Amino acid sequence: MKIAILSRNKKLYSTRRLQEAALARGHEVDIIDTLHCYMDISSNKPSVRFKGEPLPQYDAIIPRIGASITFYGTAVVRQFEMMGSFSVNESVAISRSRDKLRSMQLLSRKGIGLPRTGFAHSPDNIKDLIANVGGAPVVIKLLEGTQGIGVVLADTNKAAESIVEAFMGIKANILVQEYIKEAGGADIRCFVVGGKVVAAMKRQGAPGEFRSNLHRGGSAALVKLTAVERATAVSAAGAMGLNVCGVDLLRSSHGPVVMEVNSSPGLEGIEAATSKDVANMIIEFIENKKSKPHSTKTRGNG
């Protein structure tokens, strides 16, 4: 097969591993900087151009779309879908997962475990917003934040009110969530490929840090999932329509709750913690899907 990896940096671990896995399985691979692509949007022959030339017809594309380029990145993915390429994750599914509010509403609709959450822009009763999720301590998040940026733990109701007021001052959309104290600053990253959890790791925040992101100094280790945790991760991926994703869970007193579904999960942490060849599993998934006609759900209609 001819495969394109949409990535802004060919030296990144995840990009390199996907390229190595695809080449090892006998495929042709191009790495294309998503932002340097430009599109010819015509009704008879849509195309994507790069470095002054139209890109060839790819059997499959692997989008590695960073949060900061979601709008343009998903437009490029959608253009490839219109050209008939199979996308590991469809443009519409990536867009769903990047919108924190929309993704939580979709998970809620499917009855998937979530922390108690409030959403606001300019609430007329901040005290009620905080009380409605159980009161302090609460976690307050900027809707557009990534990698733990824009996430604040408020230990008291007064502190929570002050933080909400500060975010209101910059006209930000915010999420207010119950703090799952029993998780102990740890979460579980479940790596889902093709409707199955293929690897899982427990990420522990640095001492004194409630955020467990590896970018913030957290550590990772192999973890054994319960059947309920495994089913929750698979259901969350399905609710987003994502074939490949990282589902972040917290172990709460009332069962696993989903914190985030990541459409472009990194491979370095999960492969190091589990010693599993996740990149190879992704390429194998593409091979299996390409053997079936019409394997892209929306075929670019999204």
Swiss-Prot record:
Binds 2 magnesium or manganese ions per subunit. HAMAP family: RimK (MF_01552). ATP binds at K141, E178, Y179, D187, R211, S212, N213. The keyword Protein biosynthesis applies. Its EC number is 6.3.2.-. PANTHER family: RIBOSOMAL PROTEIN BS6--L-GLUTAMATE LIGASE (PTHR21621:SF7), RIBOSOMAL PROTEIN S6 MODIFICATION PROTEIN (PTHR21621). This is Probable alpha-L-glutamate ligase 1. GO terms for molecular function: ATP binding; metal ion binding; ribosomal S6-glutamic acid ligase activity. Belongs to the RimK family.
